[in-house]
């Protein structure tokens, strides 16, 4: 894992991508810091951090678009998967390299409350709690970007997918207000989601029987739960969408609350979007080794019989 981490970190620090991301975050922070703290004389650095959360919509797609997509495009992923490195080490090493790049502007941000303290009273506990929350929010966004980069070998598509998903999460609080909170509408929505999941499973495995069975079981279970206790569905859509409201979980950190649930939430999001890459990479590793074995057998066959 250490070798992958050093290799990935070096690639970002020897190219413009890493420096562009660092510059972008620091410039936005400087602009809002000048507006809120220096000009308006607000003593809370949390206002600045809360205002620049949108920076992840632009910065994270740029930072993560090449992390796995470029490996697949250049076919260097096959070299990694056949190397004597664990699959988890590959994924974690790449992810930690991106987190390290993000930690550079975060280290600079830690100096802002110290600068503010020279001109007035600053609540350091509140300020650095917000800094911690902002860092965890960024780590969760980076994990989403790494996952999207693994879905395609085109960097532009990876960046667009990351932007779309992050924008949807960013607007999740507003999106939830468009849905009714009645149990009937929630049940119908979940039924459509189960149908969509069955269709997606069919497109992946091309087995209509298994897809139909999964869909029918899901729909029947949904109907039974609704008949037995329909009240459980009230406001269900809002509860589900709230799980994906990344910015909403960051609000507690900016309100002088050391939110343990928020810390667990951001760590869970980071784990949830990086852990699926491990079995997928493991399957690719097995395919690469099988292909290498077949090529070796073919060379042996040619050396003995072609002559």
Residue locations for each model-derived region?
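Helix-loop-helix units of permease transmembrane domains in multi-pass membrane transporters
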Residues: 67-97
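Alpha-helical transmembrane segments and their helix-entry boundary regions
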Residues: 18-19, 90, 157-159, 263
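Alpha-helical membrane-protein architecture signal
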Residues: 2-6, 88, 92, 96, ...
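Terminal transmembrane helical anchor/hairpin motif
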Residues: 39-42, 158-161, 165-280, 285-287
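Hydrophobic alpha-helical transmembrane segments
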Residues: 1-82, 105-111, 203-206, 214, ...
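Secretory targeting signals
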Residues: 29-36, 43-46, 50-55, 97-162, ...
């Amino acid at each position: 894992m250490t070798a992958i981490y050093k290799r990935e970190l070096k690639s970002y620090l020897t190219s413009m991508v890493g420096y562009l991301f660092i510059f972008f975050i620091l410039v936005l922070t400087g602009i809002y810091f000048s507006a809120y703290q220096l000009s308006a004389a607000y003593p809370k650095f949390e206002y600045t951090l809360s205002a620049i959360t949108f920076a992840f919509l632009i910065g994270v797609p740029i930072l993560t678009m090449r992390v796995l997509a470029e490996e697949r495009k250049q076919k260097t992923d096959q070299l990694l998967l056949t190397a004597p490195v664990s699959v988890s080490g590959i994924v974690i090493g790449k992810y930690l390299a991106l987190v390290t790049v993000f930690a550079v502007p975060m280290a600079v941000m830690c100096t802002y409350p110290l600068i503010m303290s020279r001109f007035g009273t600053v609540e350091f506990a509140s300020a650095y709690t917000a800094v911690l929350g902002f860092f965890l929010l960024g780590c969760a966004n980076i994990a989403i970007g790494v996952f999207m980069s693994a879905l395609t070998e085109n960097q532009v598509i990876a960046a667009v997918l990351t932007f779309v998903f992050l924008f949807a999460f960013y607007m999740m609080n507003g999106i939830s207000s468009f849905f009714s909170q009645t149990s009937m509408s929630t049940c119908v929505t979940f039924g459509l989601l189960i149908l969509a999941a069955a269709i997606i499973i069919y497109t992946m495995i091309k087995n209509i029987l298994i897809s139909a069975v999964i869909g029918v079981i899901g729909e029947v279970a949904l109907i039974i739960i609704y008949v037995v206790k329909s009240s459980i569905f009230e406001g269900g859509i809002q509860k589900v969408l709230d799980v994906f409201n990344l910015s909403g979980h960051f609000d507690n950190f900016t309100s002088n609350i050391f939110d343990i649930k928020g810390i667990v939430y951001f760590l869970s999001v980071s784990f949830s979007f990086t852990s699926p890459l491990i079995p997928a990479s493991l399957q690719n590793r097995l395919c690469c080794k099988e292909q290498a074995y077949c090529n070796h057998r073919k060379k042996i066959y040619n050396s003995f019989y072609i002559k």
